[in-house]
């Protein structure tokens, strides 16, 4: 991940596993990383859009094993890095090491466990290191300097910067606080920093990359398209159009930094 990238998020199994695979292949053209969310019944960090996607997936009796199967199929055609996003409860119930091994075998490059605080992640980090599984931790605008450094060191793939306070979901604009946070993280962190929560258009990507981010993470905007168009050719067209717009915004922001 040298040039800034688009990190595209999808909920696995929304609206069905075959559609997820098609969506991944479509977004792959413009994405430097794909973040695949494993649906969970209580996704506390996610806004209404992604919560609804989780419900759609789980209502079809979608299981974690199916996420691994989808990823295995994707791996037959692409080596684009894939980060699996989930919550601690499903990982704990499966057994941390068992989960990490299965994710690795499926072709995952890294994991985000949204509700696992860094201070409680010692065992998890050891297991990930043992099996060469990447880790991504999150930081918010009010994260203290020392905590930011530790989170950066613990994140082998990139540090996930939460652009604002609250839950995920598309928004119109970003506050100066977000730009200041990126600049602070850019100064403090040695690893890659990617910004998520609320990004839905090319102009957003452009402004965030211009401030120094290594990538933008887009989820709700893609999931909204899937909600509206389902498993259809039109959904694929709309997803590709948005991914292209975001990718072009990233390129513009990067040019402004040079």
UniProtKB/Swiss-Prot annotation:
Gene: trpA
Pathway connected to this protein: Amino-acid biosynthesis; L-tryptophan biosynthesis; L-tryptophan from chorismate: step 5/5
Keywords: Amino-acid biosynthesis, Aromatic amino acid biosynthesis, Lyase, Tryptophan biosynthesis
Catalysis: reaction(s): (1S,2R)-1-C-(indol-3-yl)glycerol 3-phosphate + L-serine = D-glyceraldehyde 3-phosphate + L-tryptophan + H2O
GO cellular component: cytosol
InterPro entries in UniProt: Aldolase_TIM, RibuloseP-bd_barrel, Trp_synthase_alpha_AS, Trp_synthase_suA
Single GO MF annotation: tryptophan synthase activity
Pfam families xrefs: Trp_syntA (PF00290)
Keyword Amino-acid biosynthesis: yes
PROSITE patterns registered for this protein in UniProt: TRP_SYNTHASE_ALPHA
Quaternary structure annotation from Swiss-Prot or TrEMBL: Tetramer of two alpha and two beta chains.
Name of this protein: Tryptophan synthase alpha chain
Organism placement in taxonomy: Archaea, Methanobacteriati, Methanobacteriota, Methanomada group, Methanococci
EC number in record: 4.2.1.20
Active-site residues from the entry: 35, 46
Enzyme class of the recorded protein, top EC level: lyase
Family of this protein: Belongs to the TrpA family.
Record's function text: The alpha subunit is responsible for the aldol cleavage of indoleglycerol phosphate to indole and glyceraldehyde 3-phosphate.
């Amino acid at each position: 991940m040298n040039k800034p990238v688009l990190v595209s998020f999808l909920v696995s199994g929304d609206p069905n596993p075959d559609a997820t695979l098609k969506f991944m292949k479509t977004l792959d053209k413009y994405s430097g990383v794909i973040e695949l969310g494993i649906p969970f019944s209580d996704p506390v960090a996610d806004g209404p859009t992604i919560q609804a996607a989780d419900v759609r997936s789980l209502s079809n009796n979608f299981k974690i094993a199916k996420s691994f199967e989808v990823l295995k199929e994707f791996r037959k055609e692409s080596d684009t890095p894939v980060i699996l996003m989930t919550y601690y409860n499903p990982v704990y119930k499966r057994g941390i090491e068992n989960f990490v091994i299965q994710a690795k075998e499926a072709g995952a490059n890294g994991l985000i466990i949204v509700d696992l605080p860094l201070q409680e992640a010692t065992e998890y980090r050891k297991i990930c290191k043992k099996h060469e599984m990447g880790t991504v931790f999150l930081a918010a605008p009010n994260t203290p300097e020392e905590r930011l450094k530790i989170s950066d060191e613990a994140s082998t793939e990139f540090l996930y910067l939460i652009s604002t306070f609250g839950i995920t979901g598309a928004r119109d604009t970003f506050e100066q606080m977000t730009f200041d946070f990126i600049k602070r993280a850019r100064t403090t962190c040695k690893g890659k920093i990617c910004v998520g929560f609320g990004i839905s258009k090319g102009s957003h990507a452009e402004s965030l990359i211009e401030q120094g981010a290594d990538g933008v993470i887009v989820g709700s905007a893609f999931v909204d398209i899937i909600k509206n168009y389902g498993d259809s050719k039109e959904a694929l067209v709309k997803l590709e159009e948005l991914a292209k717009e975001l990718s072009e915004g990233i390129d513009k922001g990067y040019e402004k930094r040079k």
